Amino acid sequence: IHNQTVAYYRLLDKLRADFPDIEWESCASGGGRIDTGVIEHVQRCWTSDMTDALSRQCIQRWTVQNIAPEYLGAHISQPTSQQTGRTYSVAFRAATAVFHSFGIEWDITKASDADLQELASWIVWYKANRDFLHSGRFVRLDVADPAVLAHGVVAADGSRALIAHVQYE
């Protein structure tokens, strides 16, 4: 397995050198099994095939124990999760993705005009705040209520913070 892994790293390095305008993403192999050594060879890792925004909150909370948030692929998925059948607003799906490598995984040709406008607003917000989100100190807050997750980013100089409070159950 070691030789296969080293060969994979060499392949990624060659692809990055040959195609510098492409961002390469590693797979989590079903979630929770990111090869931490691959970070040196890719721009991000796909965190999990579970794209349900509420489920991703917990997955992402613990994955950032080992991988910096900006390296974790996190996308706004379709309104109704294929895995759980739960439906979420654009705001919740976007708020779940913005702390990480923000993207869109949703057939927006099927989105309403209102959802498209809200999505556009989130994209503008993310672009304006990306440097702060990816250069600050990521924090996980311990909350006594097991149905609540809280995490956020604090600017390096302490001048600013953004905290997410998630009602998990």
Model-identified regions with their sequence ranges:
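A broadly tuned, weak detector of single residues within folded domains
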Residues: 17, 90, 119, 156-157
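A glycine-rich phosphate-binding loop feature that marks nucleotide/adenosyl-phosphate handling sites
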Residues: 26-34, 112-116, 139-147
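Short amphipathic alpha-helical patches
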Residues: 38-39, 50, 120-121, 142-153
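Catalytic cores of secreted or luminal carbohydrate-active enzymes
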Residues: 91-140
